[in-house]
Amino acid sequence: MPIHIAVQGDTIAKLAKVKDVPSKVIWDDPKNKSDLQGGTLKRTDPNLLLPGDPVEVPDLETKKDSGGTEQVHKFKLADELCVLKLKLLDGNHKPHKSMKFDIFIDGVKVPTSGGPTDTTTTATTNGDGEIEVKNLRPEAARATLSYEGRTVELDIGWLDPIETPSGVLGRLQNLGYYRVEMTDPVPVVPETDPELVGAVKAFQSQYVYNPETEADKITGTVDEKTRTTLKEK
């Protein structure tokens, strides 16, 4: 079985589309269970891979089916579609409720679960500021979000696993606690970088620990509770 070395933007769903192998077959492969999801990597989400991750791609299995002679038979390969979830927050990290927006996937306007099923009407976020795009093609590369005169470009699948330093940095960036130019590969920032430590402290103060009773835990170091809270946000 061939091994694919992940690059920035790779997901199991994208690999499944390219290799014509169901994503569940790839993710559940014994080698990926032991080396990718276990070992030192401990990847927990098939849509979050780090460049350099080794992914075992199983060979296709031949399947036989019967059909009557002198008849026309149709065999349809089911598409594996994904879901893109976004959440809009204001400067105080409060959700943008019922905000009008348009979203485009690779330049094409798409409907969302929070709005109309057609693409001619502007949709709105829900009560938690959330946007959900269903039936997303696995190979989709970029989302363009327009709201309140702003346009935001998002590279789909580029967020690194939360278990990695770059995954922590990316989430702090998305939440507005840290600013760095995201490149390919994602920039390496030392965990002792003063700005990064300050960003982690700010996040811990707001979401993880009580500044009045747990001030000693607000260290700027990404502990397990901080990592879990970042993942939830």
Question: Where do the language-model regions lie?
Answer:
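Primarily a LysM-type cell-wall glycan-binding module
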Residues: 1-22, 79-82, 163-177, 183-198, ...
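Short, acidic Ser/Thr/Gly-rich low-complexity loop/linker segments typical of extracellular
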Residues: 7, 108-130, 179
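LysM (lysin motif) carbohydrate-binding repeats in extracellular/periplasmic proteins that recognize
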Residues: 7-47, 104-108, 178-179, 192-210
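Short Pro-Gly-centered beta-turn/loop motif in secreted/extracellular proteins
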Residues: 17-20, 126-142
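Short, ordered, surface-exposed loop/turn motifs in non-cytosolic proteins
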Residues: 21, 93-112
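Extracellular LysM carbohydrate-binding repeats and other cell-envelope/extracellular binding modules
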Residues: 22-72, 206-233
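A short, amphipathic beta-strand motif
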Residues: 82-92
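Acidic, Ser/Thr/Pro/Gly-enriched interdomain connector segments
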Residues: 90-93, 133-194
